[in-house]
């Protein structure tokens, strides 16, 4: 997503830009999304496919779970290729600033735009919607340094030591070498 200065005659509603003087523009890589945008012939302003404050969906089923009957149609073109939010780059400054890391890396941006800065993640005033710390907060309890795992929990582990033979475990590195 590119954060750009909003022109005075910009036809996009201020509501779609959260009342900001900037506008965030996204051009999806997905061929189906590009075909829809091309057929529309005009810019499309749309919210995220998840309820505010929830983790971004990566499959159509996640959108259905999050939004339910609030939407009439969901276009299922398979799972997202990258399970992250979009990279957000503020292009209103002399040096572009990566406001939120995502599927496009700073190195990829630098290969096109030259030098970029990276935000510390705490803007005084968000430059685009979706930039609040709580916007993508998971709605789940997290326990750190757990010494046991309950039946309804999943375990994210590291190293050879296992707490149990539970079914929901993801080991980041069995050799403890990332």
Language-model regions, residue ranges each:
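Active-site-adjacent structural elements in enzyme catalytic cores
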Residues: 1-178
């Amino acid at each position: 997503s590119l954060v750009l200065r909003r022109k005075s005659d910009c036809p996009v509603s201020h509501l779609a830009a959260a009342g900001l003087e900037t506008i965030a523009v996204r051009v999806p890589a997905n061929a189906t999304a590009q075909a829809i945008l091309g057929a529309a012939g005009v810019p499309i302003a749309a919210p995220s496919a998840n309820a505010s404050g929830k983790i971004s969906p990566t499959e159509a089923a996640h959108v259905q779970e999050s939004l339910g009957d609030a939407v009439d149609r969901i276009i299922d073109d398979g799972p997202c290729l990258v399970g992250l939010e979009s990279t957000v780059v503020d292009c209103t400054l002399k040096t572009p600033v990566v406001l939120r890391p995502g599927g496009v890396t700073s190195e990829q941006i630098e290969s096109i735009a030259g030098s970029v800065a990276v935000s510390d993640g705490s803007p005084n005033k968000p430059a685009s919607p979706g930039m609040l710390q709580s916007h993508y907060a998971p709605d789940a309890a997290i326990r750190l340094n757990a010494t046991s795992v309950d039946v309804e929990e999943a375990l994210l582990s590291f190293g050879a030591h296992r707490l149990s033979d539970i079914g929901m475990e993801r080991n980041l590195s069995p050799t403890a070498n990332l």
